[in-house]
Curated annotation (Swiss-Prot):
Keyword Ribonucleoprotein in record: no
KW Zinc-finger (keyword) present: no
Matches recorded under Gene3D superfamilies: mk0293 like domain, Transcriptional regulatory protein pf0864 domain like
Organism name: Archaeoglobus fulgidus (strain ATCC 49558 / DSM 4304 / JCM 9628 / NBRC 100126 / VC-16)
Protein name per its UniProtKB record: Putative nickel insertion protein
Length: 395
């Protein structure tokens, strides 16, 4: 698995996130194309600077006074010719900010007016960052963030002086999984930075990685530590690290357990799930639900198991190794009772060890020919093995 880790040891803002992504998630030419597609009037520069001895990229945008309603910001994004994925996620980031500001000011977020966040420079930061994230996502990356340093003290906004973290930042954090550290001088985590990281990143949990690339995005202020956001690109050092998530339930009907299984198996982070009949306390009939998940997604899967079953306790069991044979699936033509059928067949390797026809295809043939499925199964295997033996003897 490819990972992109945002190490926000000194906070994060939109321009710092974008600067850290320069050259690894987005090129300068792509940024020019995004600005052209948006049709906004911004003056910006991209430079390399030294921050306390660390070489970092810096993106600077000329700030201008201006405000827009949430609807106006959406219209700018929707009317552009950017990819639909970029539009959708940029709108989602702005909606996070709008909802937070609406909650703080006690108004409908859809009718609100952005002040600093509605200016061209903020639109530039958000949409260019989203473009970079989408590029990395297409390349197979998943996104994580270390605990973000949020700052302390007070900060001036158009509405007046606010404590750090500002109320809008705290509202954004309420709806995200980001972890923060309430420390540092001044405002270190901005609403734009909080919204972008909240939308894309999961909290970083310990797992081994191989570091492939490191990039730094510089902030504007001088602080007691290097004012940079560190982006680490790498790959997990495990190939098949999994956990078994397990819980016992004795108060759900068969229909409810079946529904839970169905919803779990629809998730891309659930590799498999089984239900085992058991007896619980006082010899009550119960079910043990076992779910296999990648290690780095185990907390989300465990939370979903609790939500679907109402269970108050979940066991997460690390599995250090599981052996998976190499597999392939192919479609073979088989003649049965004078009719030819396409049958999907799974094989495992190395060598010819297992052969398994797809049961859905077996069922179709059984219904059409009005013969039992087990007869169809035997006939398919016999025909395939016979044909392969004939080919090998002919050679």
């Amino acid at each position: 698995m490819k990972v992109a880790i945002f190490d926000a040891f000194n906070g994060a803002s939109g321009d710092m996130i974008l600067a850290s992504l320069l050259g690894v998630g987005i090129s300068e030419e792509e940024i020019d194309e995004v600005v052209k597609a948006l049709g906004i009037d911004v003056n910006y520069s991209m430079t390399t600077v030294s921050v306390r001895g660390i070489s970092a990229r810096r993106v600077e945008v000329e700030e201008r006074d201006g405000e827009r309603s949430f609807k106006e910001v959406l219209e700018i994004i929707r009317s552009s010719n950017l990819e639909e994925g970029v539009k959708k996620n940029a709108i989602a980031v702005f909606e996070l900010i709008a909802r937070a500001e609406g909650k703080v000011h006690g108004r409908d977020y859809r009718e609100g007016v952005f002040h600093e966040v509605g200016a061209d420079d903020a639109i530039f930061d958000v949409v260019c960052c989203v473009k970079a994230f989408e590029n990395l996502k297409t390349a197979g990356y998943e996104f994580f963030a270390t605990p973000v340093r949020a700052g302390s003290g007070f900060v001036e906004f158009s509405h007046g002086k606010y404590p750090v973290p500002p109320p809008a930042v705290l509202e954004i954090l309420k709806s995200s999984n980001l972890e923060v550290v309430m420390d540092g001088e001044g405002e270190l985590l901005t609403p734009t930075g909080a919204a972008i990281l909240s939308h894309y990143c999961k909290p970083l949990k310990p797992f081994p990685i191989r570091v492939k690339e490191v990039s730094y995005g510089a902030g504007k202020r001088e602080t007691d530590v290097p004012n940079v956001l560190r982006l680490i690109l790498g790959e997990t050092a495990f190939h098949d690290s999994i956990v078994v998530i397990e819980t016992s339930v004795d108060d759900l009907s068969g229909e409810m357990i079946g529904y839970a299984m169905k919803k779990l198996l629809e998730r891309d982070d659930v590799l498999d799930a089984v239900i085992i009949p058991a007896y619980g306390k006082k010899m009550r009939p119960a079910s043990i639900l076992k779910v296999i998940s990648p290690t780095h997604r185990s907390e989300e899967v465990a939370a979903e198991v609790m939500r679907l079953t109402g269970s108050l306790g979940i066991r997460i069991i690390p599995v250090h190794h599981r052996l998976i044979s190499e597999r392939m699936e192919e479609v073979v033509k088989v003649e049965i009772s004078g009719k030819e059928f396409d049958v999907r067949v799974k094989r495992s390797y190395p060598g010819f060890r297992h052969l398994k026809p797809e049961f859905d295809d077996i069922a179709v043939i059984a219904d059409e020919l009005n013969i039992p499925p087990h007869v169809v199964y035997r006939e398919i295997v016999r025909k395939i093995v016979g044909a392969e033996n004939a080919d090998s003897n002919g050679q």
